Structure formats: structure tokens, C-alpha cells
């Protein structure tokens, strides 16, 4: 998820 957890996931 983005935005949310990390820049990839």
C-alpha cells in the first residue's frame, strides 16, 4: 500500500 507501509509495498 502507498502511502502507508513502505515505498515498495
From Swiss-Prot:
It is found in: Secreted. Residues 1-9 form the Pentraxin (PTX) domain. It comes from the Eukaryota. Signal peptide: none annotated. The keyword Protease does not apply. One of its GO terms (molecular function) is carbohydrate binding. One of its GO terms (cellular component) is extracellular region. Keywords: Amyloid, Lectin, Secreted. The keyword Secreted applies. It is linked to SAP is a precursor of amyloid component P which is found in basement membrane and associated with amyloid deposits. Belongs to the pentraxin family. Homopentamer. Pentraxin (or pentaxin) have a discoid arrangement of 5 non-covalently bound subunits. This is Serum amyloid P-component. It comes from Mustelus canis.
Amino acid at each position: 500500500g502507498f502511502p502507508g507501509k513502505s515505498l515498495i509495498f
